[in-house]
């Protein structure tokens, strides 16, 4: 697998939301530590749902508690957002990020009010697990397993679950319930993406919004791509993030050597 493709698809500029969000998260972290403790108004509390505190319910992914917390979340979510944004559009991806935050917060608050009423959470790692679950569903339809070593493979669909528990072991202070809820939402989004589309604004609304803010979109620097609604087609089939000869694996063993297959021009997700 070509890891570079996760960050900078060949011959393509960086995606606008992925870059902008990374910069914004960093700026908020600096403001919180140097200017004003903004995290006090962003961290999600289990009682936030019952107080109808919309700031905390939707904005808690923006709050980070340490530099390493910020660094690992920016690095892990960047590639996921790049891939999703390229195939779904910048504005639509922003809507999805907000929906994921809200629909993760609701069950977290319900569970947390009973089991851990005094625990606050923040950070974008829930987004990472949601997108990880989403891409695992899509990838599992192309590759049923991922090669870990030359002799050991792991089911593609359950790889995020393994990573969920590894993360809990390596970072015991992280929110396992929040990550698990985010992962379940990602699985749901991958399995029922047409259902998710029904709770997002219609395409014509997104196009209208982009028309209104077009002067601002045109200010985006060269080398950073804003994927407009008119440029994307969310009905296109998923393309594996694995490149070259690994892009498809057989689902069963065969005793006869496979005949050479035509190697067409591959494309990165969303092209």
Curated annotation (Swiss-Prot):
Gene Ontology CC: one annotated term: Golgi membrane
Active-site positions on this chain: 125 (nucleophile), 179
Molecular function via GO: serine-type endopeptidase activity
EC numbers for this chain: 3.4.21.105
A Pfam entry, by short name: Rhomboid
Domain of life of the organism encoding this protein: Eukaryota
Primary enzyme class: hydrolase
Substrates-to-products reaction catalysed: Cleaves type-1 transmembrane domains using a catalytic dyad composed of serine and histidine that are contributed by different transmembrane domains
Region of interest called Disordered, as start-end residue ranges on this chain: 252-271
Topology versus the membrane: Multi-pass membrane protein
Location of this chain's protein in the cell: Golgi apparatus membrane; Golgi apparatus, cis-Golgi network membrane
Transmembrane segments: 16-36, 64-84, 89-111, 115-137, 152-172, 176-196
Keywords linked to the UniProt accession: Golgi apparatus, Hydrolase, Membrane, Protease, Serine protease, Transmembrane, Transmembrane helix
GO BP terms in the entry: proteolysis
InterPro entries: Peptidase_S54_rhomboid_dom, Rhomboid-like_sf
Family: Belongs to the peptidase S54 family.
Protein role: Probable rhomboid-type serine protease that catalyzes intramembrane proteolysis.
Protein name: Rhomboid-type serine protease 2
Gene: RBD2
């Amino acid at each position: 697998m070509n890891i570079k493709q996760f960050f900078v698809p060949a011959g393509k500029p960086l995606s606008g939301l992925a870059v902008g969000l990374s910069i914004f998260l960093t700026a908020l972290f600096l403001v919180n530590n140097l200017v004003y403790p903004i995290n006090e108004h962003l961290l999600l509390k289990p009682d936030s749902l019952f107080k109808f505190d919309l700031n905390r319910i939707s904005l808690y992914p923006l709050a980070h508690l340490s530099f390493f917390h910020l660094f690992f979340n920016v690095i892990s979510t960047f590639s996921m957002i790049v891939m999703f944004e390229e195939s779904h559009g910048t504005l639509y991806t922003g809507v999805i990020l907000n929906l994921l935050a809200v629909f993760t917060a609701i069950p977290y608050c319900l569970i947390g009010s009973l089991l851990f009423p005094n625990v606050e959470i923040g950070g974008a790692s829930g987004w990472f697990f949601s997108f990880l679950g989403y891409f695992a569903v899509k990838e599992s339809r192309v590759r049923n397993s991922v090669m870990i070593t030359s002799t050991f493979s792991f089911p593609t669909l359950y790889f995020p679950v393994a990573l969920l528990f590894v993360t809990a072991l390596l970072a015991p202070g992280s929110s396992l319930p929040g990550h698990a809820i985010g992962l379940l939402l990602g699985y749901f989004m991958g399995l029922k993406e047409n259902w998710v589309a029904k709770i997002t604004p219609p395409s014509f609304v997104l196009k209208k919004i982009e028309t209104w803010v077009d002067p601002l979109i045109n200010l985006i620097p060269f080398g950073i791509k804003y994927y407009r609604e008119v440029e994307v087609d969310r009905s296109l089939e998923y393309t594996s993030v694995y490149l070259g000869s690994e892009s498809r694996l057989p689902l069963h063993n065969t005793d006869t050597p496979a005949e050479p297959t035509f190697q067409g021009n591959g494309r990165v997700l969303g092209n």
